[in-house]
């Protein structure tokens, strides 16, 4: 199976080559440089996906081939940066005592953004100009919001806050202090799931406060990305098996609605996870179409790299032929002592710059307010 040339180009240019990081019994770990020194440094490694909590970190790698060794792995493949694959030996139905700390809410008045309204609207116009020239059909343009956070706050406590205030179907969290990984995800979007040989993706395109506010532009945008996802899955699935089984489903989420479509296929024989990721990453809904042209525009317009935001986040269990990877949207992470959160919008020729800015505000408003609250397990 040949990976998509677009995905291969992206993985080569945005994921820096590095020797495998491996941690196993009796072996030292080669550290990935921590971007958040001191943050949560006394906490033990831990993961949560759904109602299961991962403990007892057994292996740590940045090579996707590691998951073929078996076990259940937490997976973080950032939009920009080094991937992390972490195998936890124990998965339990409740958090262990004293393994979740506290979250001291961030100051609501000190959020900063990588693009203010004027800059963002100018980026929308630049993208529309590229569309008018036929260079691209759709591009997802994002900005990163940042805020200072207490160095002894625990991302798992923020995850608990998100679970209470923003229940999401593909939520999860990962804390590995020794390599600076602190991520809490409340994603409504499925990048990939696997059950046996079946591979499923559920791209989101189209966002509004209410269903009646959805526009024809939202529907057109969704259909464009469905075609892109069908093409991606066809690179790792049996010929003729890839199909859209649900189109333009309206889903209600806290504070907004989304248009969601479902695409599925049957994985070809001898195709492993490295082939699947190479064929489909990054997710089409947060890149654009055609993907390589959209990624070039993103690189030229976004002043801050996305890091984990818009990447893949979830788990893979090769032994049971199952997996669930979210598109890492509605996701908080810690970088250099700052809490970060990305928000964006899909730009088409029919986009209004002011309305696209407001969409980024809508997506950020509810979750930002949750991060401004405090939480303590006791």
Q: Model-found features: residue ranges?
A:
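Extended alpha-helical targeting/anchoring segments
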Residues: 11, 16-378
């Amino acid at each position: 199976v040949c990976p998509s040339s677009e995905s291969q180009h992206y993985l080569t240019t945005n994921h820096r080559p590095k020797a495998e990081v491996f941690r196993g019994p009796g072996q030292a770990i080669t550290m990935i440089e921590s971007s958040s020194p001191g943050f949560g440094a006394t906490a033990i490694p831990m993961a949560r996906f759904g109602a299961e909590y991962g403990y007892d970190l057994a292996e740590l790698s940045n090579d996707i081939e590691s998951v073929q060794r078996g076990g259940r792995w937490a997976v973080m493949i950032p939009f920009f940066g080094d991937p992390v694959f972490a195998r936890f030996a124990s998965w339990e139905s409740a958090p262990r005592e004293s393994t979740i700390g506290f979250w001291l809410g961030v100051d609501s008045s000190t959020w900063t953004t990588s693009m203010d309204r004027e800059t963002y609207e100018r980026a929308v116009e630049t993208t529309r100009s590229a569309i008018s020239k036929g260079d691209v059909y759709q591009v997802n343009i994002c900005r990163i919001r940042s805020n200072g956070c207490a160095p002894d706050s625990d991302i798992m406590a923020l995850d608990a806050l998100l679970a209470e205030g923003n229940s999401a179907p593909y939520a999860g969290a990962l804390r590995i202090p020794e390599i600076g990984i602190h991520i809490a995800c409340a994603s409504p979007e499925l990048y990939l799931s696997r059950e046996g040989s079946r591979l499923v993706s559920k791209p989101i395109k189209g966002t509004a406060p209410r269903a009646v506010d959805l526009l024809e532009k939202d529907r057109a945008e969704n259909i464009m990305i469905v075609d892109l996802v069908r093409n991606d899955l066809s690179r790792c699935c049996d010929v003729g098996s890839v199909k859209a089984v649900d189109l333009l489903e309206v889903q209600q989420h806290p504070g907004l609605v989304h248009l969601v479509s479902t695409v599925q296929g049957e994985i070809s024989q001898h195709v492993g996870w490295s082939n699947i990721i190479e064929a489909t990453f990054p997710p089409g809904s947060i890149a654009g179409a055609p993907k390589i042209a959209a990624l070039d525009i993103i690189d030229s317009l976004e002043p801050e790299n996305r890091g984990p935001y818009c990447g893949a986040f979830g788990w893979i269990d090769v032994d049971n032929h199952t997996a669930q990877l979210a598109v890492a949207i509605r996701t908080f992470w810690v970088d250099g002592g700052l809490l970060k959160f990305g928000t964006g919008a899909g730009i088409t020729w029919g986009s209004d710059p002011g309305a696209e800015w407001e969409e980024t505000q809508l997506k950020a408003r509810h979750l930002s307010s949750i991060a401004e609250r405090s939480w303590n397990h006791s």
